[in-house]
Structure formats: C-alpha cells, structure tokens
Amino acid sequence: MSNIPSIREKCTGALLASAIGDALGWPYEFRSRNTNENLQMGQGHFVDWHRKSGGRYWNHNEMILAGEYSDDTQMILAVSRSLISGYDWKDYFSHKELPYWLKYERGGGNALKTAAKTYKENNTPWKSKNAGDYFCAGGNGATMRILPHVIANAYFSNTEQLMDDVFSNSIITHGHPRAILGATCYAYALNVILHKETILQFGELINIIIDGVNVWGRFREHVLPTDWDNYKNLNFEYNYLNEWSNCTNSIIDKLLYIDKSLKKGLLVNDSTVLTELKCFDKENGAGDVAVLAALYLVSKYANNPILGIKTAAYTVGIDTDTIACITGGLFGMLCGTGWIPAEWRMVQDYNCLCNIAEILLSNDMKATSKRISDSNINNQELRSSPIGKIFIDKVFEIPSGKSSKIIITKICTLLGQTLYLKQYERVTEDVQSTESNKNVLCSNNKIMSSKQIRFNLAKLSSVSSDPSFSRITFKKIVQIINLLCDGASNCDQIAKKLKVDECMVKAIQDAMN
C-alpha cells in the first residue's frame, strides 16, 4: 500500500472485513452443519446455503442467505451496543446483550451459550455449577468480539486501558488463559496497526507483537471482579497462573515460528504453517490458535488482502468463519475500505457496520447513535427489546418434523442490524375452548354427513397433554374416529390396523363418550 488510510477508514474497514470474512467462511466451518453437499468452495463470493438447526427435538433446515454472518459478527455488534449504551458496558453486555442473543444466535459455541444462559439466570459463570467448564473454556468466542474496544479507544491511544477492557470483556464468558490471551494479543495487534503511520514492513507486525508481550501477556488481576477468586484454588486440571505463563510462552514460540517461516518468502507453505499452529487439530477453535493463524495470513498477504481472506475462509479443516473474521479485522485495519470488492459490500448489514464505526469513533457515542437511529425511523411500528427499539420486518415459518414448527421473526434494530428471532411451537389441532367442561362439536367429511360426535373437552385436553400423544399424527386421529364411528369397538384391532398404541385408541374412545 502506498497510502496510509485514515483512522476512520481503518476502523470502518476492520468492521466490514470482519463481517465479510465471517460470511465467506461460515458455510465451510466444520461446525456449520451445512447441508449443501455440492457447495463449491473458493469462488470468492457469498452463497446461499442451508444449515441443520434445532438439535434433536427441533430439527429443521435453516436458509442462510448470501452474505449473512454468524455469531462472530453478532458478538462484535453486541459489544458495540454495550459500549454505546451509556451504561456500564460490562453489565449491559452480561445482562442485556448475552441473554437476548440466545433468541437469535447463529452458530454460537458452547461456552458463549452456557455463559449467556447463566447470566439469564442472574448468576455468573465463575460462581455457577458450570464453573469448572468456564475455567476450561479457551475458545475463540472472546477473541472474535473485542474489535469495538479498539475502535472506541482509537483517539485516546491508552493501550493499558484497552488491555484492561479486553481482559474484562473476555472473562465475562471465558475463563481459560488461552481465550483471554488470544483476545489481548488480537487487540494489541489491531491497535498497533491502527496507530501505525508508516507502511508496515514484511514481517514487522510479528516482531512488534513479540516485543509487546509484557503488555498483552500480563495477567491483569486488578480488573478482576471481587468474586472472581476461583482461579487461586482450582482443584481441577491446572494451576491457573502456571497455565497463564505456559500459554503466553506458547504464543511467543508460535510467533517466533511464524517469523522464521515468513523469512522463506515465496517458499513458505500455508498448510505447513497452519498445521504447526494447530489449526487442523482438535484445539483449532482455541483463542490463541485463531489469532496466530490470522497474524500469519495478514503478514504473508499484506499486499493482497483479498487472497488472504479467501485463504482463511476456504482452507478445509480450520475454523474458517472465526479465523477469516479475525483475519478480515486485521486486513481492514491495515488497508481501510478501498480494497473491498463491490460484491463483498453486499455483506449483511453493511450500512449498520459503517454506522457503528462512526458512533464508536465519535466524542458522544450516545448522541451520535440517537441521531443515526432517528434517521432510520420511517413510520415503522417500534417495539421495545432488552437491546433497544426494534421493528418487525417479516414473519415466516419452517416445519420441524411432523408435529412442530419454527416461527422466525425477522427484526431490525434502529442502527440497521438484522436479527432472526426463533420461537419453537408444537403443531396441535385447531381446537379452541373457553370452559373446561364444554363439549366440542367436530365434523369429518366421511362420517359427519350423517353423524355428529361430541368430545368431552376436559378428557380430550388430558389426552393431548400426554407426551406420548405427540407421536400420533392428526391423520391417524381422524382414522381412529372414523373406525369408532363406523361401529368398531375393539380398540386392540384398531390399534394393530393403524399401528398405534392401544391406550391412545382407548383414550380417544373415552373422550367421545
């Protein structure tokens, strides 16, 4: 690059490229549950795809539109709103953003979801029954979300305060040193690039980060919550401060390896380096692994950010969405926005990301946020939510098996973020009641031309609330009623004929009496 982008260009580029990397890499991430077997990799543009969602009991295929991002960018925007809110950002993020995120999360990791559920119950992860899991949570869920702190600190240049904030943010959901150090190392790298006023030389970034280990690698006990003392008396797996030191040393060793590899120039092999960085191992989702991979790719492809992001997004076997997101954040901070192709500017919530950059850089974030929010109000019916005013764009349904459905409400925030809220419902017969003992008149095309049946609603309600009743379809219920109304009284024969439990037939017969 011949020109150094402005601070605003850098910060806007970092937010946009983070979302772009996330959206490019998400379909190919090993945990994405992509059901499109023939999806071609490496084309360099956004794609529509389907993901298997809902787990065992609410299984459904969810359509992901081209350019839509995952939890990585969702968390970046959640942290941004927390900083903009005007309240204590740690409290806002913990008790507003995280619990609400459970309604719209896309691809969130276990540590994040567990922490969010814990805060929803008005508890903290380090004091909960899952405290052991919390202190073993070393994933990249903390690293991926800390970019807004760097942007909000852009004009203050207070590196120590930045590190304090990133440390404080990380421990809200992750307790293992790998997660926290991954976040502080990433923030330090972003901050170095943000304030670099000369062209970054090949490999220079790696050496600057190595030299800064006493800043990003320091355990910041002074910012710990007063009740965050479990780390001193952990009775499982590791001694905390020893593990902190070991993880710091491991990151430095890997950075030295990257530096040595980069000196090979054109002979350096991406696969070899990423393998050494553990990107293909079971620990490939760790916070330190993600940031090390991103630092390598940004250092190697500094003059070709498009290729660098593609490499992160399309390398089979690595954590493609998060590594591409972090790589994108570094490239955006380095190169600004001018390099971003037109097709990549179709990323979900492009305008929102630009707005967030403007707000985080402003002297009065709350006032700037209000000005932008007010300009986006166009006669919508606004509704309140824990994260501010929203409006509904549309509502649609997705089937989940034979007896369930997912109601998806697409909403928008006033800053322009799109969220898909999910509501899970069992599909039941459309029978309404107002009194517990009221009889309901039911008709069926075959039998009701000459007959009428009366159901005792109290009995029918009792039957339908039985968990086993959910296994029988409405069609089978009608067939049972047909046979009973035609004079068949042998419940055993009806059950065998229709392959249902005899107790269900008897229950329906009893409700008809």
Can you describe what each PLM-predicted range is?
Residues A488-S489:
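Residue-level signal for the short linker/turn that defines the boundary of a DNA-recognition helix
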Residues Q493-A495:
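Short alpha-helical "recognition helix" segments of helix-turn-helix
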